């Protein structure tokens, strides 16, 4: 009897990782799973890398979950997965760095984390609606060099370096108006 198809969910690995299974593919949710019981969120994007008819079956399954499928070439899987990893890591590092800064101002750790996450959520909503450049606010976007200087003067070396890195990233991406 023919073997059933097999897929794996490792975003950076090609379908060949399942050799010698004849019908194989990748079906990777672009979502963080901090626990084994984290449910797939509606509207999650799934990267699909498979030949036909498996690709059609995976796209249909993705839609049944209320999610979206994007077709990927095997050679693009490491780039795709690196984007996912970097997005999460940069976000979480920013929550930690900025949260620590707020605790120096009297916030409890939980207050600081909540405040930073709420701030980010608003910016991310705007970025999703209108693009990253439209979501950018603050002194860099206004060309307010005086405020940037005051920020840098108030920060220790570690936090000043992190702040400058964030400004450079925004400038390098052409997001400031």
Regions found by a protein language model. Give the residues of each.
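Short glycine/serine/threonine-biased micro-segments
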Residues: 9, 45, 141
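Short, well-ordered alpha-helical microsegments
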Residues: 14-16, 55, 148
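NAD(P)-dependent Rossmann-like dehydrogenase/reductase catalytic/cofactor-binding core
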Residues: 114-177
């Amino acid at each position: 009897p023919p073997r059933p198809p097999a897929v794996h969910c490792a975003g950076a690995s090609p379908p060949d990782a399942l050799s010698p299974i004849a019908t194989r593919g990748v079906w990777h949710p672009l979502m963080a799973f901090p626990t084994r019981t984290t449910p797939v969120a509606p509207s999650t994007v799934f990267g699909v890398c498979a030949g036909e008819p498996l690709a059609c079956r995976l796209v249909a399954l993705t839609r049944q979950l209320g999610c979206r499928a994007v077709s990927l070439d095997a050679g693009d899987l490491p780039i795709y997965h690196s984007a996912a990893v970097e997005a999460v890591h940069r976000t979480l590092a920013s929550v930690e760095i900025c949260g620590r800064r707020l605790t120096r101002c009297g916030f409890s750790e939980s207050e600081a984390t909540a405040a930073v996450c709420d701030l980010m959520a608003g910016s991310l909503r705007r970025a999703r609606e209108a693009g990253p450049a439209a979501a950018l606010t603050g002194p860099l976007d206004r060309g307010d060099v005086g405020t940037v200087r005051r920020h840098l003067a108030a920060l220790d070396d570690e936090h000043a370096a992190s702040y400058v890195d964030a400004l450079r990233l925004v400038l390098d991406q052409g997001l400031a108006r």
